[in-house]
């Protein structure tokens, strides 16, 4: 049959982490330290001088922190991680630590102890990839550095500190709450540390001065991008004034099944072997803590949302909240969530299918986790799957389901599992709700008397009453019912105490503001609703996304969330900041009710009385009452008349009138069942060969079996002693005397070893009437059979050559247990007493290995002595005095004793005569004077002989305190106050001399020094030793690079040649000149002309500086010019090509005076166009010797000259070819 399941949808919450004071975060802070991928950018806090708060208000105290002993005497200023100093201390040991903070306004003496119980011994974090395990991480004992405790000087105070690097944490008193942090070095100047005489190492400031609203001193950390911001809203999304309810198991009732109406099929290996325990877990472990050894699995989607570096801290934070919910006083039990392992899934795993379909995913996960087992064969009690998908209970797509779990599956190998959707810190409520289903809890208002709208953890919809979640009375009853079954025995395992993986000491709402909580519930664009209507976010967080509408999921803002100016949420109420809200009210028991009527009129029934935790009820996180809610006792123990109907048979007969599978049957008891089923009503139909369990439990007071005093109560077989006291360990001795010593009877023994003919009965022993403790057994396996008859030859066992089956046979006033196996000797056992004489015979079938027998008979005069009536008396038990003198205390407690010998339940004694108990003073006389010595100071030297001292004073303890007295009153001589220490020789060490001067005055150079191995004993002169002697440390460097200053780069000077000048004549033959000039080349590639003497140190290139030129032949006058009225005009031909590409060239053209296309005269000379023109006058580069290996090594070298980087050492060399061309 498929297990029934339950689901829950709860709050999504992402919160705000306050920036640490002056950008200084504690080294061991467990909160996230950086934004996850995809999160908004992280703004840097402003410099310290710009921050408001305690730094500017002066509401701080600079304190010195140091370790002291339990008397408050100084030990050391070195406060390091305590476990790292004492690695031999096991994790399970609760280690004490005493610290003192001393400042100008505060002097705190703290008594601390290590935390425990969240993670189990051997806790590991295992990462699984495609090919299996990728990594396994542990939490080493030395990494646990968290302490809790109180202040000696303040009542009702509490301290929670981390000692990982310095001291960080919170100190709470009735007057104020304080934060303690290491003093950042870069704030020392601002706080005036240098001006003070002492050396404070920490800063202590009130929590009321801590910044609250998001601002310059906060860092927004987004560890998950919520996909719902981009999804369409459900039809029930809340509009302004129309609240949207969150359904834990979805809105469709057909997918919210009821508990199984029939017994589930139980696989042989479904429960641990301890399931066969007969006793109730609640009674066998009444005042003990029940531990749920929990395995947590995180899927791939959730890993992607949070990141591998943050997921472990996030999950442990969630489970820490779950642990607190199960320790809430309203649950009515003492349940501890102990995490045994964390599995991180980076890739899909074979056999595990995770999808939006919650039902299918749960089925796959339950099967997958059932195969997980430790290397030593150990298994977890409970498995939790955390998924980043939006799951749905009835389809493979997102909907309003948050969780799914089988009902009453706890401790089952295949059904103790849940699936939970990640919704931020509200995930803790989902896990608690689904685990509640695993404990057998049903939704409030569904088949029970509790109301749906009370705002409890098991409500069908997620809506806290006044922002407070608790367990309803129905949930408490379901849990009590489950813990009363044998199935819950797996929770009796007691993990060894471990040190707790500590979390940030601040409240969640202080770490994450309301805007961030809205983002996790409604997406990236959501923020706290600020529209014009008043809503109390401490009862329901209202958020705004778009338009003029606000929405809520009826989850209150997290504890510590700012709800107004100088106000915060505490316990569902908006109270003044620093107030704790409503104080917790611890529950107390009401008076016992009267005893109920006896469940039977004879034969031993059960009566009970109860009390309620209602005087008052626990509220606001108060503890539930300790102890049992019900007390049981046996009643009407006299035997029933002989003609009365057997009590179990009467219960079977009640079903005769009820139809079973379509017809009526006559039922009678069937008792051949396993021990764990003795208290179920198994009946067999008369005339048929089938039997059936007609009820899961018989009526209270029904004997577990015919031959046992034990009775069934609530379906559990409870032990009854021979003194007819429920739960008593009293047993009869072999004489049948309750708690006897075997002295009231005579034990008869014998051994029958004769051999006879086969297939005949032979007499072995005659057992008289009244015999007890009868035992007849073969010495070895044989083919013969033990037979029993009475004196009238009536056979009860194996008579008339007929062999009976092994089993229980009732005859002669007692029950005989007959056992026979093919590989075990035959034996017959009975408790007695018998009411007739029995004759034991042997049906001989072959060789006789020997048959032993024994029984007891009462001594004369002891048979009919009636048992004495027990007496019940109060007794006082005093503890040892806490001190031997000087005033101490001792504890006085009461106990109820039977016959002043055996302690029993206190309900048997008269409550009116109950003695007064508590703490009483003792040993008030003054102690004799004695020497009081303090701890030795640190040695003045670490080696070579030093000294240390300690305070020594003569004191006397009087009235719980010590007072100094004259030293003459103490025994002499006085203890030594000074002693030698560290007398061992100092090891040799390296001695390094001063560094020599740098080899270069500019640029990179080298310097050296002398290094030698020398002795370090302070009592002798240092001696040079061979280098091989100094082996404890590496030899210091003898050479190192040095740079005094950078060298100035030389100017890049070079000779440049000018362009050729114009020809000295305009026609015929002339000359041209050019000049060498000194120039400096800029990075951009341009040149600046300098005086020639600047380049005097450079060789001048050998170039031609003068050359001949002939622009055009000079024109000749025509021999004849015709006279006429027309005058010629100047005509010019196109310019010729430039005579040089650089350095100055000449272009020429022909200029003629023409008229009508013929040469003419009369052209005006001053109008004649120019016949030559200078061209390409820019400098020519000096021809340099080309590097045979000059080439480009990258395809982007063309960009180097464009950006003026050819002068760069790297780029100029790698792009040599391109840079050389750019200079042309």
From Swiss-Prot:
Protein name: A disintegrin and metalloproteinase with thrombospondin motifs 16
Every PLAC domain range: 1186-1223
Region (Spacer): 747-873
Location of the TSP type-1 domain: 586-641, 874-922, 927-987, 988-1048, 1051-1115, 1127-1181
Gene this chain is encoded by: ADAMTS16
Lineage: Eukaryota, Metazoa, Chordata, Craniata, Vertebrata
Enzyme class, spelled out: hydrolase
Cystine crosslinks: 366-417, 392-399, 411-490, 450-474, 518-543, 529-550, 538-569, 563-574, 598-635, 602-640, 613-625, 939-981, 943-986, 954-970
UniProt note on tissues of expression: Expressed in fetal lung and kidney and in adult prostate and ovary.
Gene3D superfamilies assigned to the protein according to its UniProt record, in alphabetical order: 2.60.120.830, 3.40.1620.60, Collagenase (Catalytic Domain), Thrombospondin type-1 (TSP1) repeat
